[in-house]
Amino acid sequence: MSDQAPSVKPPAFGPGVVVKGTWHPDYAEVLTPEALEFVAKLARNFGERRLALLERRKTVQAAWSKGARPHFLPETKAVREGDWTVAPLPADLQDRRVEITGPVDRKMVINALNSGANVFMADFEDANSPTWDNVVRGQINLRDAVRGTISFTAENGKHYALNPKRAVLFVRPRGWHLPERHIEIDGKPISGSLLDFGLFFFHNAREQLARGTGPYFYLPKMQSHLEARLWNDVFHLAQAELGIPRGTIKATVLIETLPAAFEMDEILYELREHSAGLNCGRWDYIFSFIKTLQSDTRVVLPDRGQVTMDKAFLNAYSQLLIQTCHRRNVHAMGGMAAFIPIKGDAAANDAVMDKVRADKLREVKNGHDGTWVAHPGLVEIARDIFDSHMKGPNQLSNKREDVKIGEAELLKVPSGTRTEEGLRHNIRVGIQYTAAWLGGLGCVPLYNLMEDAATAEISRAQVWQWIHHGASLEDGRKVTLTLFRDALGEEMGRLEKEGAKERYGAAHLERARVLFEQLSTAGTFEDFLTLPAYDALEAQR
């Protein structure tokens, strides 16, 4: 069933609450008057503060674009140097050695919960294209998953259901910047963050507690401890409204923006009643590095395949994250292995799996307490590495007091080369992912990697950076608009020969090309691809 399918008119809800999206009868399972009144209360209490924090982002970015650089905040020095820890974690969050992530699609939810991972992060954010149907059905799917009743029968007759032993569920709502235009509160679109969090929490928190677990979340894209403070206040109100003890909610924050890396202690402190640690978000972090320092000619990056977690600013922030979390007695989660198994080519598959092993070995030896994978086929590989080197449930006792990371290390640019193939790869991947996203898919296998929105962001950001600063390729040529547009035309021809029109739809592919070209060649850097892409998604309804 899709957004465009015939539907009935949405029912009337409470004062000021309007559902503008299409309506299917089963939407009433989660879009109840009580649930929408709950999210309306969140919106009325926190909506203006959210918008003010988004305005603050613009002000801070303007200063960086004029030459200022991110730094540790002098006004929060006492927090960084203080002797405090976060609240104790529940039993089912002590061992998180392997976590799998994926969209809220019904079959994928079942497969991820059955994957053998310790945790499944169900994603309303980067792995989900936020069509109205995807958003609402994702909530239905998770409600059924929490109750153990979720099942799915594919067109070929294959039946999917939950195993008795399954992963602990986390949910990632959308970031603070994303609106949800299909629900208005007092004439304004609700925050996607508050809707995703609010609906899930309202329908499932008590049920999860009754089943011996709890409402656990991943929080994305934050840029400051003030944004973490907002989440903490949301949690307080939500728990009070449902009569659930304060501190029941636990949340892991993704450190996937450069500014947040300078405020990790502060973010943990703001969420200290609710914290379940921090996580390294690689692709978005690289994207944020480019965005934050967009005017600085000294930070033009090499091909993104050369910007790896063992290099320069990425290595520095991952080490500092471990030290910070363990000092506060909470988990430091490693990053994503986005590789997917390669069928029909044993040698290529072995090479990819060796890369995964090396990445996970680096993480566990550095002191991470767990790691992410994007495909069930990688769960066992990641688990074997962590089992061999992490004998207890976690490594919180490894305080990494040897780590000495300052502002210079967090801003250090890795050495490497820029190539025409690197440019073309960004074009191919960015356009294909965006085309799939416009077609309602947020999690897309491309060139043996499971890609999400962070991939499209880093692709267009890097192309913009190279063009904007006239970066030199390894053969001496400058990256110009002409070079980019010539490559774009040739890559579109290649994609069409490879069947991209049939795979994604000709209209989606063309919209993706236009959007990618606009963002890559704009005079100013667009904050998020997903904002104009959401406009395009809505325009085709």
UniProtKB/Swiss-Prot annotation:
InterPro entries assigned to the protein according to its UniProt record, in alphabetical order: Malate_synth_C_sf (IPR044856), Malate_synth_sf (IPR011076), Malate_synthA (IPR006252), Malate_synthase_CS (IPR019830), Malate_synthase_TIM (IPR001465), MS_C (IPR048355), MS_N (IPR048356), MS_N_TIM-barrel_dom (IPR046363)
Cellular component GO terms, alphabetical: cytoplasm
GO process annotations (BP): glyoxylate cycle; tricarboxylic acid cycle
Keywords for this protein: Cytoplasm, Glyoxylate bypass, Transferase, Tricarboxylic acid cycle
Pathway recorded for this protein: Carbohydrate metabolism; glyoxylate cycle; (S)-malate from isocitrate: step 2/2
Catalytic activity: glyoxylate + acetyl-CoA + H2O = (S)-malate + CoA + H(+)
Class of this enzyme: transferase
Catalytic residues (UniProt): 172 (proton acceptor), 452 (proton donor)
E.C. no: 2.3.3.9
Similarity comment: Belongs to the malate synthase family.
PANTHER family: MALATE SYNTHASE, MALATE SYNTHASE 1-RELATED
Family matches, as NCBIfam families: malate_syn_A
Protein name, per record: Malate synthase
Species assigned in the record: Myxococcus xanthus (strain DK1622)
